[in-house]
Amino acid sequence: MSAVLPPVLTVQVDSADSSLAWASLGERRWRCVVGAGGVREDKVEGDGATPAGTYPLRHLYFRNDRLVLPKVRLPARAIGEHDGWCDDPRSPAYNRLVRIPNEWSHEKMWREDGLYDLLVVVGYNDDPPEGEWGSAIFLHIARDDMSPTHGCVAFARDDLLEIVTLIGPETKLNVHSVSAAEQRPRPRSDEDDDMKQFEDFDEQDW
């Protein structure tokens, strides 16, 4: 009898330096965005890229003052006002949830823009965290204009609410590009160019 493969949430971008992507799980499909630095196998802290590869999904965090969490199978915890995520490679708590304020560089989990109202922690560079290979890689809510992230994978709010009901501890995240050999820097500073790229992507025959 052949082994049953665990489900995989696949994120595929058009090219290694693109930020526009499609995610799929079984027959379901969602539009999403990745980092402004594209998808890279050689990701480092602060490069704005999403790491290529296959990773576990650890657990999820949510704002219980902003949404009602549906039934999920991943471990879940409500975000507090003093929760942060350490992005300082010098810290012993690098790429970990921390209490803030503290002396190390970190990002706030309690955000006013709604991007972290719901997020899933991706098991990237966390077992254990090493060097400066990057931190705080999440699945989270996208901005309304679906602009690139700083390295996470972002979805429309309703889509992410659906996704978290379908994934579990056995689910893996696979991120790759159609042209995985392309590894060019892709600075994105012109918002109009970003939106034009998104429109062109949406018109492709999928």
Q: What are these model-derived regions, one by one?
A:
Residues 1-149, 159-206:
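Cell wall/extracellular polymer interaction/catalysis modules
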Residues 152:
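Short cysteine clusters
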Residues 156:
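Conserved "landmark" site that anchors the functional core of diverse proteins
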